[in-house]
């Protein structure tokens, strides 16, 4: 058995966020490393690695030496948490798209051919495609402290749902202590703390929008409602990944 070093020696990108209410010329940006949420598959004799925000993918014959390939404009290269799966002769790609319907993309060789788009009919975040041994196709998604992990069966040719979406996993922090935020599983934020965070964030968002000559993306009360959920003490349920081993899902 071979063992491989982690972290891997790969180039990755940075993301620069402009700070609202800058305190000085040397404090204009926050800098974040990227290339999270990787999917790794074996496809036609090569390993393929697709990380977030990399605008491309890596290939390797041995999991040690990697080559980078840039993705084309036909695919949403900056959508987070790309999921890549093999179905027949094709590699299928999807990535996170909230607020509008996502799509699936497929190709027989991403190094030399463009991806073909297959429109989807619903939005999703943190997607995971699963092809069962009998050829039936299932799709899972979710990344929220307000929504559960969902699942749905898809038509293998059209990639359209053939069932209604089903709730797979919900948080139950009221009965499962390990799901609770905070040291010693004690909620770290009071209602007053949460409201203060919401007001601070709204103020920052308004300042940034004003600088850019824009408006808030939604009415202020809707934004506040979303922020209250974001800053709440509820745990995030995310990163769905279905696999099958010795007959067990």
Placement of each model-derived feature along the sequence:
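Carbohydrate-active catalytic/glycan-binding domains of CAZyme proteins
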Residues: 1-249
């Amino acid at each position: 058995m071979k063992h491989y070093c982690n972290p891997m020696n790969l180039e990755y990108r940075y993301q620069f966020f402009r700070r609202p209410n800058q305190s000085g010329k040397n404090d204009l940006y926050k800098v974040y490393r990227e290339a999270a949420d990787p999917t790794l598959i074996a496809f036609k004799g090569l390993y393929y690695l697709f990380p977030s925000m990399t605008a491309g993918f890596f290939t390797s014959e041995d999991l040690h030496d990697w080559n980078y390939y840039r993705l084309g404009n036909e695919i949403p290269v900056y959508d987070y948490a790309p999921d890549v799966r093999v179905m027949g002769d094709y590699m299928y790609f999807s990535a996170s798209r909230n607020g509008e319907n996502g799509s699936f993309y497929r190709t027989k060789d991403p190094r030399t051919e463009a991806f073909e788009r297959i429109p989807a009919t619903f939005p999703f975040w943190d997607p995971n495609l699963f092809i069962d041994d009998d050829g039936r196709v299932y799709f899972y998604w979710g990344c929220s402290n307000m929504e559960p992990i969902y699942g749905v069966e898809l038509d293998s040719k059209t990639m359209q749902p053939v069932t209604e979406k089903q709730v797979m996993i919900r948080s139950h922090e009221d009965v499962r202590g390990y799901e609770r935020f905070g040291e010693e599983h004690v909620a770290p934020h009071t209602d007053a703390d949460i409201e203060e965070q919401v007001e601070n964030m709204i103020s920052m968002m308004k300042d940034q929008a004003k600088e850019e000559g824009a408006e808030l993306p939604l009415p202020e009360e809707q934004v506040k409602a979303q922020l209250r959920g974001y800053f709440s003490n509820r745990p995030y349920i995310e990163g769905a990944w279905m696999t099958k081993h010795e007959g067990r899902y």
